[in-house]
Amino acid sequence: MKRYVFMLSDGTGITAETLGNSLITQFENIQFEKITIPYIDSTHRAESVVLRINQCFSEQGTKPLVFMTLVDPEIRQAIKKAHACVFDLFSIFIGPLENELEEKSSYTVGRTHGVANVKSYSHRIEAIDFALSHDDGIKTRGYDKADIILIGVSRCGKTPSCLYMALQYGILAANYPFTEEDLVGFRLPEVLRPYKQKLFGLTIDAQRLQQIRSERRPNSKYASAEQCRLEVTEVEAMYQRENIPYINSTKYSIEEISTKVLAIAGLQRKI
């Protein structure tokens, strides 16, 4: 069975996508065709979206699902005229909040992902810049400013996790990959010892590591099953020997890796 799913927003669409995806992933036997439409900022644009939704209804014979985070009441009402099952994620929560807080909402578009808070936005940019300039062990001199330093073998998820922590949490995250030289005896590199309290390890199943590396450098020693097993075994032994906290990233998304790392490390959101 296939169902169309529309994620509608007057902003970036990130919130509608996040909430919508969280709900539909609970239905494993249904194939969802997802369509995100951001920046619906007028009733005219809303009406064109309704035409598109209705077209899907006519073609499929089943109502599309619509998850929307639209602030303007007129635009919301326009969307609700569609032949669809509409989930108004804004009005579901804003009414009860107004009652509890005894204050009316400002109904301002773009509060979540906009630049309303200049200080928060500036810190996010600083964190992203830090993650990029301290990626892959490129620059270790700034490690004293890092909130956390991810370590691990090559291709276990360090770089995307650091960027996600920077973008979503404003965390200053660096990462250091273990090289061929580090593999000899697999001792903690001296450059990392002064920052041991900031270190957090990632590991990965050897079979999965081989798959990832083979896509990058097929038929190489780097991607061989033996090399991957050796590196994973040695790095996990080193984590345990050095008392460095670590998680296995094999079955987790980047979002899950990042939140687990922050929770275990006891780091709080900065933005």
Swiss-Prot record:
Its EC number is 2.7.11.33, 2.7.4.28. Pfam families: Kinase-PPPase. Keywords: Kinase, Nucleotide-binding, Serine/threonine-protein kinase, Transferase. GO terms for molecular function: ADP binding; ATP binding; phosphotransferase activity, phosphate group as acceptor; protein serine/threonine kinase activity. NCBIfam families: PRK05339.1. Bifunctional serine/threonine kinase and phosphorylase involved in the regulation of the phosphoenolpyruvate synthase (PEPS) by catalyzing its phosphorylation/dephosphorylation. Belongs to the pyruvate, phosphate/water dikinase regulatory protein family. PSRP subfamily. PANTHER family: PYRUVATE, PHOSPHATE DIKINASE REGULATORY PROTEIN 1, CHLOROPLASTIC. This is Putative phosphoenolpyruvate synthase regulatory protein. It comes from Legionella pneumophila subsp. pneumophila (strain Philadelphia 1 / ATCC 33152 / DSM 7513). The lineage of its organism: Bacteria, Pseudomonadati, Pseudomonadota, Gammaproteobacteria, Legionellales.
